[in-house]
């Protein structure tokens, strides 16, 4: 078994399998994040505090949660591919499109984790922080917010990597030859092309397309581009 960061390499497991602490909700009395754990601390015969493996239990102890890791699926999708086509409408108008998709797998959204567990005053919070625990009795999936609080890197920030992206749409119009008159032009086509039009996934602002190891953080997403052009044949 080889553990590397958030993932594990193990015989019989898919590559890029996530190996992380597992959350167990939020304590409605204290607002603390709860975790499943199978490590605890005990005093040995020499009076020394040691970590001991035990039956699974639920705790808000971050140290014990960080030691107790679980398998959470892989970055690998179940299915991925693209769909595209091009065709002509009314003789002179052409239209083409290209889409890509991926179904299954997970990514760890480091930016989401950072905006839900802010370490410094003045940093931005994610909009999901509005669901946070605020008073005893609140039942929510978002723990109390603490600047500089202690949290385990857990499955809370594992997001489905499934997506559907509209990569390109191109619309063109070829002028009838009679419109070209006496110009020494065989054909003239005017077109507009739109790149990276839309992305539909499970987290606004996250782009799972180009990271194959499973970590999404400070990386550039493809820019949306609109271009116009002419195709001339003489």
Describe these PLM feature segments.
Residues 83, 95-97, 188-192, 228:
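Transmembrane beta-strands of outer-membrane beta-barrel proteins
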Residues 102-190, 194:
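Extracytoplasmic gating/loop element in the C-terminal half of outer-membrane beta-barrel translocons
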Residues 4-32, 129-130, 135-137, 151, ...:
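C-terminal beta-signal and terminal closure region of outer-membrane beta-barrel proteins
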Residues 1-75:
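Conserved small-residue
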Residues 92-95, 178-179:
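Repeated loop/turn-to-beta-strand initiation elements of outer-membrane beta-barrel proteins
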Residues 1-2, 108-114, 203-208:
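Outer-membrane beta-barrel translocator domains and adjoining extracellular loop/strand segments
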Residues 77-81, 162-167, 222-226:
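Residues that define the transmembrane beta-barrel architecture of outer-membrane proteins
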Residues 84-88, 172-176, 231-233:
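Transmembrane beta-barrel domains of outer membrane proteins
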């Amino acid at each position: 078994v080889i553990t590397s960061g958030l993932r594990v390499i193990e015989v019989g497991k898919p590559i890029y399998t996530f190996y992380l602490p597992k959350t167990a909700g939020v304590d409605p009395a204290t607002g603390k994040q709860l975790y499943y754990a199978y490590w605890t601390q005990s005093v040995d015969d020499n009076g020394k505090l040691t970590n001991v493996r035990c039956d699974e239990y639920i705790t808000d102890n971050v140290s014990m949660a960080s030691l107790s890791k679980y398998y959470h699926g892989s970055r690998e999708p179940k299915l991925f591919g693209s769909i595209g086509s091009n065709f002509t409408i009314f003789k002179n108008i052409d239209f083409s499109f290209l889409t890509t998709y991926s179904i299954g797998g997970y990514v760890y959204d480091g930016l989401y984790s950072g905006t839900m567990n802010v370490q410094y005053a003045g940093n931005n919070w994610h909009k999901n922080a509005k669901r946070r625990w605020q008073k005893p009795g609140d039942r929510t999936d978002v723990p109390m917010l603490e600047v500089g609080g202690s949290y385990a890197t857990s499955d809370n920030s594992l997001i489905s990597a499934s997506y559907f992206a509209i990569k390109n749409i191109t619309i063109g119009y070829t002028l009838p030859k009679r419109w070209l008159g006496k110009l020494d032009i065989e054909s003239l086509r005017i077109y507009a092309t739109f790149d990276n039009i839309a992305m539909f996934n499970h987290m606004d602002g996250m782009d799972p397309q180009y990271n194959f190891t499973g970590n999404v953080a400070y990386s550039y997403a493809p820019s949306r581009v609109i271009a116009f052009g002419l195709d001339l044949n003489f």
